[in-house]
Swiss-Prot record:
This is Nucleoid-associated protein SUN_2278. Keywords: Cytoplasm, DNA-binding. Gene3D superfamilies: Nucleoid-associated protein YbaB-like domain. Its main location: cytoplasm. Pfam families: YbaB_DNA_bd (PF02575). It comes from Sulfurovum sp. (strain NBC37-1). Belongs to the YbaB/EbfC family. It is found in: Cytoplasm, Nucleoid. Signal peptide: none annotated. One of its GO terms (molecular function) is DNA binding. The keyword Transport does not apply.
Length: 103
């Protein structure tokens, strides 16, 4: 079952992947994603670690609580999806070129 697999090489690759994952987590804090809802009435910005770092709400929404809630939820979901897509993309990139079964 494990014929042809270099376990030492695989262990080293796992260490490299862990180091790269830590590196990517640190870099994620410096990447920003912005989502807009309601034609720009609400704008939410978060970093790659998922922390909301800025939010703009148009004054016209302050009197309409229901619309504000709907648009805020939409913008938050959109920015979270952007962050998740970025994480998946980075994970796939990290896996590229790694072959535990030898050359």
């Amino acid at each position: 079952m494990f014929e042809g697999m270099d376990l030492g090489k695989m262990g080293k690759m796992m260490e490299q992947m862990q180091e790269k994952a830590k590196e990517l987590q640190e870099q994620a804090k410096n990447v920003e994603f912005t989502a807009k809802a309601g034609g720009g009435l609400i704008e939410v910005t978060a970093n790659g670690a998922g922390e909301v770092i800025d939010m703009n709400i148009d004054d016209s929404l302050l009197e309409d609580k229901e619309s504000l809630q709907i648009l805020l939820i939409s913008a938050m979901n959109d920015v979270n999806k952007m962050i998740e897509d970025n994480k998946k993309s980075q994970a796939m990139g990290m896996m590229g070129g790694m072959n535990p079964f030898g050359s």
